[in-house]
Every structure is written in C-alpha cells, then in structure tokens.
C-alpha cells in the first residue's frame, strides 16, 4: 500500500510532483516528517485536511500534540482548525473542536460570521446554541447573509438579536439592491412595527436600478410619500421598461426635460432599444421638439448624440429606428461610421456605408479602426480597396500594440519601415513588447534607438521591456543624471535591475529623497542609502510630514541614522535646524 512505502521513495515522489503533493501525503504514515521536509505551511496542511473532511487525521494530530510527539510547526492549532472548518462548512469538525475546548467566539465571532456568509444554516444554528454573538463586527453575519440571499439565516439572526438597522439600514438596502423580495417585506415590516423612519426613496432607487419589479411595486404600494425622480432616471439608464411603464401608470409625469433626455442618451449607449423607442414615441417626440424648444442647436445636438451613442452600443435595430424617425446620420465627416469602426461594430459600418449618400473618407476610418484594434473593420476596409500604402494606419496600430493589425496591413502593402523607429520608441514607452520584438525581427535597429528606447522604457516603468532592450545591447550608460528622478520614482524592482546591470547612483536630488520619505517608501530609501546616496540631512517639513502621517517605521529609521534637519531661510538658503531629529520627534 502507498502508506507503507519507505520515506526515501516518498522523497522521490515529492520531488517529481512538486506542489501537487499534499493530498498524496495525507495517505502516508510519514505525513508530518514529509510535510516539514516539503516546507508545507501549517495553514496549507490544515486547509487540505479540513476541506476534505479528514476528521480522523485531525484527531490524530491532536493526540500527537497532547503527547508532545509532533513538530511545533504543525502541532494542533484549534483556532485555525475552527476558522477553516467554518469556512468549508464542516459541522462535525466544528463540534469536535468545541468538545475539546475551542472557543466559538474567536476573531470577533468569526465562525458565525462566515457560516452566515456562506449559507451554512446548520452551523449557524449550532453556534447560536453554543452562545455565539450574532451581532459582532457591526452585524456582519446579518449583512452577509442578506447580501447572499440566505433568508432562513437572516430570520434566525434577527430572532437572536441581530440589528436590522445596523450600518444605516444596510440589510434592507442590500435586499432591495440584490432583489430579495421576501427579505424586503420582512425588514420593512420590522421597520413599520417600531414606526422607524427610513429613506424610502433610496430603497426604491436601489430596487429600480436592479430591475426588481416586485420589490418596486411593493415599496410604492406601501408608501404614501415616495419620490420617483432619482429612481426614474436610473430605470431609464438601466433599460427597465416594465418599471418605467409602472411608474407612469402611477401618475409619474416624465416631461421632455434635460434629465430625461440625458437618461435616454445613456439608454442608447447601453443598447436599451425598447426603452429608447418607448420614450421617443411617447415622451420626447422628436417630431414635436421644435414646438417646445426655440433652440435648434440643442435639438440638433440631442439627435446627433442619439446616433453616436447608438453606434457605441452596436444596436443595429435601434439605429434603423432612429433613422426612421428622420434623424440624419451623415454629419461631421461621417462620425457615426467612424465611431462604429472604433468599436469594431462591422455590421453597423456596413449598414451606414450602404445607405450613405455623401462621400466617405475611408482612409480616416481605417486609421481609427487600426488605432483601436478593430481587426474585423480593418479587414473589411482593406477588402474594399482602401489605400493602406499612403496613410498612417500601420503607425496607429503599432503604437497601440495591435500586432495582428500591423502584420495584416503590412501584408497588404503598408510601409512599416517608414515608421518602424517611431513605433519602436512608442512601444517602449507603453510596454508593447510583442510589437518591439516583431520590428527587431525584420529590421536592423540603430544602437542609438536602442539606447533612447531604454531611457523611455525605464522612465515609464516597463521592466520587461527594459530587460529585453538590455539583452539586445542597449547601453545602461545612456541613462543620464537628469533621467534618474523619473526612474527612481518607479518600482524598486526596476531600479534594482538597472543597478545590477551597471547603473551608477552616487547622488540624487534632495527633493526626490524628500518625496520618497513622504511616500513612506522605506525599502527604496534603504536601498538608495545602501548604494551610497548621501542623506546626512533632510528638510524639517519632510520630517514633520512623517510625524503627521504617523509613519512610525520611517521615523524610527531616520532617528536611528541621526539625520540632521535643515530648513529654508527666506532668502532661500538652507540652514541647520537647532533641533535634531530625536528632539523634534519628541515634540
């Protein structure tokens, strides 16, 4: 049997399996020796035991712990076991732990909080019988049970004293937001029973925004003084037509006002065709807008925005509907086509092209599609014969990292060599290593370009790109003193790499040291000092900033180095402060 294998063979098995050994170790009599050998953490070991419900192994560990026959690293940890047993819903293990003295109230009543969060009703009932505190941590158990829809647990917690008004009435808000109608009625009745004043308008907005029709109807019927304004706008933006119609049936007057129009535009952008159609046919009435508004410009802008937002959404039926209402789509150099192309909505592009009666600048549309990585539209335009040789589409695709489009355009005659240096440098800034490598594979890059790219990549915190450029021969010495501030301001890992490759940092601007201290970046400060950066003094305002922000570790470090404080005179020269850092920190 597996358990009888000599531990030498187990060692070979472990070496072969790597990180996937823990479950196999659980069947070995050498479990504890091998777990220590593999450097498996106590938490990882216990997690595997409890998640799989191996209570006998847990009992065995406890027995060895009591007898002092087990490594301190993996001896019985009752609290950790309780936390994990609660998380994974192992009631039998929880009962075993409690019988052996584990406190169910550990970590601010963590067990009942997590059992409520994950919906373990049997565990919650057991913990309540064992006298846990269901209200701990701002009634966390009630809030999480509500959010996750565990109504039976919610009722049980409330019966045991959990506060339905906790955290500014969070439970009923969560029930409205996530659509639990039974819970909403339950909490609402609790409020009414004690004549509790609460924000009904907010509850209606939460339910409306989520499209929870039953809850909306319930709240409206139970209130005599509810306001619909915020909820109405939210319903339109989210596209909940049934709730919108219900509001209107209750006497809500929408009107053709700016808020309604803005909400309609948002509905267009989200593709809610049914809501847009209903509003335009019944409320906004584009045909009659001129009768209500003297400002033609405002009407024209609204119509254009309807079209552009619809193009963003990609909803062809809605676009056709708007056109049927007489809205013009040929404006601002075919902006609707360009927007559709930028979002890779090929079906809209084809439709708009098919109905266009004005000249279309296909080359500009190709550039926009390439810039935004819209390969379907790019291929369509190239198939239509759009010129790729004499425009900047390949440049736009390259600097934005869209290698697939770069290759496609190049294969169809686009001139990459014309822009390859500029693309190379831009990609160094943005970390588009795939494009950089492709350019290197095709062209001989001048050493000065490599060096310039290294500076750009270093300043923009692109570690992978920096490593590649150094590997390809970029010279670390090309990084000058005036480049240092931006580079040092980036991640420490990048700085360490550059130093390991020969970057010399003997001194830096004092204001950069101050910035590092005020940002509480102690690791970076220590590293710079280890490189020999002079930090015998700092400005008083920098030190005071550490005090104000309570950066204790930074303060302790500065004091331990006996850093001198300096201040600036009115003339702008630096003077030593009469107080040293220790005196200042005491003050």
From Swiss-Prot:
Repeat (ANK) residue spans along the chain: 77-106, 108-136, 137-166, 168-196, 199-228, 230-256, 259-288, 302-331, 333-360, 361-390, 392-418, 420-448, 449-478, 480-507, 509-537, 539-567
Keywords (A to Z) from UniProt: ANK repeat, Repeat
Organism superkingdom: Viruses
Any Pfam family hit: Ank_2
Protein name: Putative ankyrin repeat protein L66
């Amino acid at each position: 049997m597996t358990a009888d294998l000599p531990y030498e063979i187990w060692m070979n098995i472990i070496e072969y399996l790597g990180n996937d050994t823990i479950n196999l170790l659980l069947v070995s009599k050498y479990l504890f020796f091998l777990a220590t050998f593999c450097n498996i953490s106590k938490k990882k070991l216990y997690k595997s035991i409890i998640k799989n419900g191996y209570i006998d192994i847990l009992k065995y560990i406890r027995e060895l712990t009591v007898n002092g026959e087990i490594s301190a690293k993996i001896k019985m940890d009752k609290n950790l076991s309780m936390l994990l047993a609660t998380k994974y819903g192992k009631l039998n293990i929880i009962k075993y732990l409690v019988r052996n003295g584990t406190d169910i109230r550990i970590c601010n009543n963590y067990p009942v909080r997590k059992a409520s969060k994950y919906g373990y009703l049997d565990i919650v009932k057991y913990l309540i019988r064992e006298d846990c505190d269901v209200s701990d941590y701002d009634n966390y158990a009630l809030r999480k049970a509500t959010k996750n829809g565990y109504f039976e647990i919610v009722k049980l917690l409330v019966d045991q004293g959990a506060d339905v008004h906790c955290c500014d009435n969070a439970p009923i808000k969560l029930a409205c937001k996530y659509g639990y109608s039974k819970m909403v009625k339950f909490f609402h009745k609790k409020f009414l029973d004690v004549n509790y004043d609460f924000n009904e308008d907010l509850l209606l907005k939460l339910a409306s925004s989520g499209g929870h029709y039953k809850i909306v109807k319930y709240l409206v019927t139970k209130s005599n003084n509810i306001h619909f304004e915020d909820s109405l706008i939210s319903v339109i933006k989210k596209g909940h037509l049934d709730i919108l119609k219900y509001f209107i049936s209750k006497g809500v007057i929408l009107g053709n006002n700016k808020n309604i129009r803005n909400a309609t535009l948002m509905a267009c952008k989200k593709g809610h065709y049914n809501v847009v159609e209903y509003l335009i046919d019944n409320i906004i009435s584009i045909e009659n807008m001129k009768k209500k508004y003297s400002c033609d410009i405002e009407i024209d802008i609204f119509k254009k925005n309807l079209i552009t937002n619809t193009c963003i959404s990609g909803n062809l039926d809605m676009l056709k509907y708007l056109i049927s209402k007489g809205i013009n789509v040929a404006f601002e150099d075919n902006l609707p086509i360009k927007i559709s192309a930028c979002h890779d909505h090929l079906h809209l592009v084809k439709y708009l092209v098919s109905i266009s009666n004005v000249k279309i600048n296909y080359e500009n549309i190709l550039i926009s599609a390439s810039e935004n990585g819209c390969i379907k539209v790019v291929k369509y335009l190239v198939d239509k014969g759009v010129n790729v040789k004499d425009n900047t589409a390949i440049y736009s695709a390259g600097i934005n990292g869209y290698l697939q489009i770069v290759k496609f355009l190049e294969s169809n005659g686009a001139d990459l060599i014309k822009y390859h240096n500029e693309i190379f440098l831009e990609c160094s800034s943005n970390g588009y290593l795939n494009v950089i490598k492709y350019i290197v594979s095709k062209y001989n890059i001048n050493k000065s370009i490599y060096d310039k790219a290294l500076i750009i990549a270093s300043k923009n915190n692109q570690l992978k790109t920096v490593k590649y450029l150094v590997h390809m021969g970029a010279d670390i010495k090309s990084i000058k003193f005036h480049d240092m501030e931006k580079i040092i301001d980036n991640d420490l890992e990048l700085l360490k790499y550059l130093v390991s490759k020969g970057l010399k940092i003997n001194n830096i601007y004092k204001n950069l040291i101050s910035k590092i201290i005020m940002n509480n970046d102690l690791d970076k400060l220590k590293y710079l000092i280890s490189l020999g950066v002079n930090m015998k003094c700092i400005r008083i305002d920098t030190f005071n900033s550490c005090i104000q922000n309570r950066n204790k570790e930074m303060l302790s470090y500065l004091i331990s180095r006996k850093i001198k404080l300096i201040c600036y005179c009115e003339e702008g020269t630096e003077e030593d402060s009469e107080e040293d850092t220790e005196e200042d920190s005491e003050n």
